[in-house]
Amino acid sequence: MRNTVKYQHKALIDKLTNLRQERKLSQEKLALTIGVDTKLFGQWERKLVEPKLFNLLCWCEALQVYFTISNDDGEF
């Protein structure tokens, strides 16, 4: 049986969007930092398009936050 990893992308995107706004970074600046089109970045924040995991990791890195994976017990 194949394991599938799912994530609550909407909650994560809300947190990343709030962090960007708190740090007073524009969508354009953050999109440029992570190497994606500003329009696409805006679609991610509006939850019109789901970013790939790689893009989420780049987004986290640009905001200097950690992306961790755990199971329900807090272990992996």
What do the predicted segments below correspond to?
Residues 24-43:
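Short alpha-helical DNA-recognition segment
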Residues 52-69:
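DNA major-groove recognition helix of helix-turn-helix/homeodomain DNA-binding modules
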Residues 21, 32, 61:
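Alpha-helical residues within the helix-turn-helix
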Residues 15, 26, 52-55:
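Residues that mark the N-terminal boundary/hinge immediately upstream of a DNA-recognition element
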Residues 1-22:
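A short, Lys/Arg-rich alpha-helix, primarily the initiator
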Residues 70-76:
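Short amphipathic recognition helices of helix-turn-helix/homeodomain-type DNA-binding modules
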